[in-house]
Amino acid sequence: VAIIIYSMYGHIAKYGNFPGQWK
């Protein structure tokens, strides 16, 4: 489960948007 959260934060740091928005 931690991997999923880590990926979400990774997207936010990269794209600067929330996972829900990026998805």
Curated annotation (Swiss-Prot):
This is Unknown protein 1. It comes from the Eukaryota.
